[in-house]
Each structure stands twice: as C-alpha cells, then as structure tokens.
Amino acid sequence: MTVLYIDADACPVKDEVYKVAARYGLKTFVVSNSWIRVPLTPAIEQIVVDAGPDIADDWIAERAGPGDVVITNDIPLADRVLKAGGAALGTTGRLFTVDTIGSALASRMIGEHLRSMGEITSGPKAFGPADRSKFLQALDTAVVKARRVVR
C-alpha cells in the first residue's frame, strides 16, 4: 500500500497532502523536528524527531520505498528516496526522477559553493495559488502511479 511521507518542517503544502491522502485513504507520516498541528485521523501520524541536521530526512529515507511518495524540497533526501525505489515530489510539483536528480544535486552544490564564497544568490520565488494547484495535480499523478507499483 502506498504511504505518503511529508518532510514537514517549512512545508507549505501540508493541507493539500492531507486532502489527497484522505481521497485515496493513504497512511501519511508528517515528519518534523517540532510539534505541528495535524488532522486528528488514524491515517495521519505525526513523527517528531530530535532537532539536528538530517534527522527527519534519515527517518524518512529509512522507511520510504517502492510505491511510496515523499514530499520534500530537500534534494539529497529526494536522491535517497529515488535510490530506495520511492517517488519524490517537491512542494512546487516538481517530480524528481533518476534522470533529473543528478542535475538538481549539481545545481545545489554550485549554489552552496557560491554562497560560501560570499555571493548573494536569489531564494525561491513567492509561493502562490498557481503553485498549490500545480502541486495538487502532480501529487495526484504521483499517487496514482505509485499505487500501481508492486511491493
């Protein structure tokens, strides 16, 4: 059965994920390093991990596998999920694939290098209604595809 995992710290589309999870009856883990409000339903479980780099990512990566969908903007986590056979979807609806993850990792490393040299890089653009709509469509598509995966 498909499971959804939300890398929930700073995730702007949690409510959208809850709606899709309810529509398909999917177990959903909301993973963060602090308490956040989640719907009171047995299908949605909040996991609070210790604060620290990559602890939430590790929790998700150790569990996600074929047929699961992970919602994250963390490119290294997306890479780990793909290597485990799962699907990784960014909050803007960007589906990470084995064909695109390498360039995403490279772009991330270049940005980190530029920032370490004192270069000012632009952050992400403001998140708006069109982004939410694109995300919902992409999540629905990812869930339909993931449900076809044989575990």
Swiss-Prot record:
Disulfide partners: none
Family, as annotated: Belongs to the UPF0178 family.
Entry-linked NCBIfam families: PRK00124.1
Protein name: UPF0178 protein Caul_3070
